[in-house]
Amino acid sequence: EKICFEYLKNCNFEKKLENFYKKKTILITGGAGAIGSNLAISLSKLVGKRGKIIVLDNLSAIRDEEPWNLPSLENMIFVKGDIRNDEDLKRVFKERPEIIFHLAAFFANQNSVDYPENSASVDVMGQIKLLEYAALTNVERFVYASSGCAIYGSYPKLPLVEDFISMHLTTPYQINKMTGEMYCNFYNHHYGLKTVNCRFFNSYGPGEVSGQYRNVIPNFLFWSR
């Protein structure tokens, strides 16, 4: 860990990040959630006053009693909408996003077991529609929020190897997330759209809430009170 931080410090990583994102227009789907809102706040600082952050979220996973994670910022636009809806996508793509962070999802495993059709509708068909818009408008980069449990399965062999792919998938969420990675690869090879697949493992942090369909660590913290 110490070596890693020293490397980042010596190579001016923060400055390179700032130079890369400066003045960019960035679309974040699912940007009102815990990960998305923290990402939006961080990127809003990097893009600067001449850049723009567009947050697209249908707020389906937010309960009335939960705090609103997104601040009101001069360079941030919030659009309440659905990635499956053409009118909503046309609205955000009018802003000409250069980079997309696709975090919107029908979250997560148990929810997908209870409602498999809704899960496939959002996590597969919604993503295909978003990828299509990204390819047609020459988006520079499409970053997809995948899942470690989806790719490595419920019972992976240890130690894990990064290029290992499991067929032991036990929930529609796992199946859909793996499918999402494959569609990213397809749009990369077929259309030249630059895509990045990020595999999250039980993420937690500011803005996370507990609940039946939420991540395990926030639930542990809630139950321990």
Stretches with model-predicted labels:
Residues 93, 168, 209-213, 225:
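Residue-level signature of the cytosolic catalytic core of signaling kinases
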